[in-house]
C-alpha cells in the first residue's frame, strides 16, 4: 500500500529527495496541530507520515507552500544554531588565544599552563564525544 502512495506522489513531485523533504515538512505541520477535521476523521489511526503522503498524492496541499515553509524552518534552525555556536565558543577561543611569549616563566606558571591545556583538551573531547574510557 505504501508503494502505491509513493508512486502517486512521484507523479506529482518528480524528485524523490524533494518528496521526502516535503513529506517531512507536512508531517511536522501535522505533528504541531495543522490538520483538517475531515481529514483527521478519514485517516484516524494512521501515522502522520502516511497522512502526509496521501495529502501530497491527492493534491490536497500546495507543494510550493510546503517547500517555502521548509526553507523558512531550515533558516530559523540555522540562525539559532549559528548564534549558539558563536556565543559558546567565544570564551573558549579567547582562552586559546590568551597566551604569552614570555620565556622567563617560573615552574608554577608552566604547571598552570599544562592544567589549562588539559582542561581545553577535555572540553574538546567532551564536544566530540570521544571521551577516553579507562579499562
From Swiss-Prot:
It holds the Pfam family RNA_pol_Rpb6. Residues 107-135 are annotated as: Disordered. Residues 112-135 have a biased composition (Acidic residues). Its EC number is 2.7.7.6. Disulfide bonds: none annotated. Signal peptide: none annotated. GO terms for biological process: DNA-templated transcription. Gene3D superfamilies: 3.90.940.10. It catalyses: RNA(n) + a ribonucleoside 5'-triphosphate = RNA(n+1) + diphosphate. Keywords: DNA-directed RNA polymerase, Nucleotidyltransferase, Transcription, Transferase. Belongs to the RNA polymerase subunit omega family. The RNAP catalytic core consists of 2 alpha, 1 beta, 1 beta' and 1 omega subunit. When a sigma factor is associated with the core the holoenzyme is formed, which can initiate transcription. Promotes RNA polymerase assembly. Latches the N- and C-terminal regions of the beta' subunit thereby facilitating its interaction with the beta and alpha subunits. This is DNA-directed RNA polymerase subunit omega. It comes from Wolbachia sp. subsp. Drosophila simulans (strain wRi). The lineage of its organism: Bacteria, Pseudomonadati, Pseudomonadota, Alphaproteobacteria, Rickettsiales. The gene is rpoZ.
